[in-house]
């Protein structure tokens, strides 16, 4: 079966192809489809379904979509749904010009923001599940087969 993957990320396509070798996994750019839906949701779940529906409306075929990110407890869950656009504490939802920074730069900003937060700890830091540097990774995942056939899962991995 041909399944569209609602992403432009070739790495995700490779991973999904390995997980589902009996299916043809296609990303929009493989077929010249311009696909960049506005992720206006407030949760990973909402953004995932936005992407799934948007691509399904174009291809009218099975679509897999996901949205995921890291949420750091000491900095109020940032970067959260903005993980892929995160550009430091000054631009937690991404740079105004839309330019994305490298993953290495994102990591440096995130560690710097966390370290600053830990310099002035809040009383609830001790209550975090895995200590003051605790975080969790959340992934919402959809298989969209049309308005009446939707399969969804969301998992959180604590750390």
Q: How should these model regions be labeled?
A:
Residues 2-4, 11-159:
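Anionic-ligand binding patches
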């Amino acid at each position: 079966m041909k399944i569209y993957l609602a992403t432009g990320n070739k790495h995700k396509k490779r991973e999904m192809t390995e997980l589902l070798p009996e299916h043809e996994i296609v990303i929009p750019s493989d077929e010249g489809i311009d696909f960049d839906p506005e992720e206006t949701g407030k949760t990973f779940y909402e953004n995932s379904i936005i992407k799934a529906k948007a691509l399904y409306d174009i291809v009218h075929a099975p679509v897999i979509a996901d949205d995921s990110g890291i949420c750091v407890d000491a900095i109020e869950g940032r970067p959260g749904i903005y993980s892929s656009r995160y550009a430091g504490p000054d631009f937690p939802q991404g740079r105004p010009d839309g330019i994305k920074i490298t993953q290495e730069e994102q990591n440096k900003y995130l560690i710097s923001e966390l370290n600053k937060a830990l310099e002035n700890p809040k009383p609830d830091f001790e209550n975090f599940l895995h200590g003051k540097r605790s975080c969790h990774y959340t992934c919402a995942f959809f298989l969209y087969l049309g308005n009446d056939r939707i399969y969804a899962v969301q998992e959180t991995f604590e750390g």
